[in-house]
């Protein structure tokens, strides 16, 4: 009886740990009027606010994070680390080839474990949808272009 109780508790503990580990992989959600886009395990996914099966938007080598819908919901801006640098990218909200928007070459500041977070964090869009706001940590004369 004690052995069965121990095994039951052990299996329950392992299951709870696995669920908690998986939940920690889901990060940085952003919504528009009908969908939520989020990072999960380093890739971006989108799902209806009503629920359902999430659609994988990216599957690149490197991390994608901090997704933000455009005001019209047609595009997603996000931060990604593909070629060593952490840069801002843009792609259609339905998925597709990302377009790199920033070229800052800041390898020394792109440590994902840094307490300040990575460089070029996508923050928001302007209300008219013409510009993407992002946080950049360059302090040596970067002029915002």
Predicted regions mapped to residue ranges:
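A flexible loop/linker signature enriched in serine peptidases of the S9 family
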Residues: 21, 40-45, 60-64, 79-89, ...
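Blade-terminus and WD-like Trp-Asp/Gly-His loop motifs, strongest in beta-propeller folds
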Residues: 30-33, 67-75, 122-131
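Sec-dependent N-terminal signal peptides
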Residues: 4-14
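Sec/Tat signal peptide C-region and signal peptidase I cleavage site
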Residues: 16-20
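Beta-strand-rich domains and repeat architectures in extracellular enzymes and scaffolds
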Residues: 21-47
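Conserved beta-strand positions that form and line the central face of beta-propeller blades
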Residues: 28, 56-57, 100-101
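N-terminal, post-signal-peptide region of Sec/Tat-exported proteins
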Residues: 39-75
